[in-house]
Design a protein with these regions (language model features):
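Active-site bordering "gate/hinge" segments
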Residues: 2-215
């Protein structure tokens, strides 16, 4: 299943084509839209927002039953819900959290493969690069930063990411072995100590799902 904003339509097409080329039997696209989402929260009554439609629950169960891999592409405007009633947002989040609990558990326990990626959305790009000469330049600059972060500019991006993931895993393994009781952060104006519970677990950039597949 692919969750992606309508603004990223062309990227969605590329992802769907590649998924089928790699052997996917079905690619379900769950479109998101900042404008439609905002209008819903501004105008829908509370009794509608704190209830999750049965079709959404049925879709979740369908995805779980078929052990569907999940890819979330995030590009939303960080300020899309500015000014929206906080009680409405809270009620909706609580309802979704309860109804989608099976999916959350399956994801957190890596019973299915999942990942989250970023795409350059216009409103997001304008907030990150407010001094860009044009909207197009702002989006290009944000894509550039995303590509750098994801090693896209490397000669072999996949190998570069695998090497990065291996480094992260080695760090996580070390932290799990040490089992520090706390983390102490210091900087100008900062002196923060965060306690850690016994038997805490550090994770990195990769995992193995219940079917023994790496992701």
């Amino acid at each position: 299943a692919l969750s992606i904003d309508v603004e990223q339509r062309e990227l969605a097409h590329l992802i769907v084509k590649e998924a089928y080329a790699l052997g996917a039997h079905e690619v379900i696209v769950q479109w998101t839209d900042d404008v439609i989402n905002r209008e819903k929260f501004l105008h829908a009554p509370m009794e509608r927002l704190d209830n999750v439609p049965e079709y959404k629950i049925a879709e979740m169960n369908y995805l779980l039953e078929n052990k569907a891999s999940r890819l979330g592409v995030r590009s939303s405007d960080p300020g899309a819900l500015n000014g929206v009633d906080a009680d409405k947002l809270s009620a909706s989040a609580k309802a979704m959290g309860l109804s989608m609990k099976p999916m959350r558990i399956a994801t957190q326990s890596n019973k299915v493969s999942w990942t989250v990626a970023a795409a350059a959305g216009l409103e997001w790009a304008k907030k990150v690069f407010p001094n860009a000469a044009s909207d197009e330049e702002a989006v290009d600059l944000l894509w550039d930063q995303i590509f750098k972060t994801c090693r896209v500019y490397e000669a072999d991006p996949v190998k570069a990411w695998e090497e990065h993931a291996a480094i992260l895993k080695s760090k996580a393994d070390m932290l799990n072995k040490e089992q520090f009781s706390a983390l102490h952060y210091t900087a100008p104006g900062t002196d923060l100590t965060l306690g850690l519970p016994k038997n805490h677990v550090w994770e990195s950039a990769g995992a193995i799902n219940a079917q023994g597949e790496g992701f």
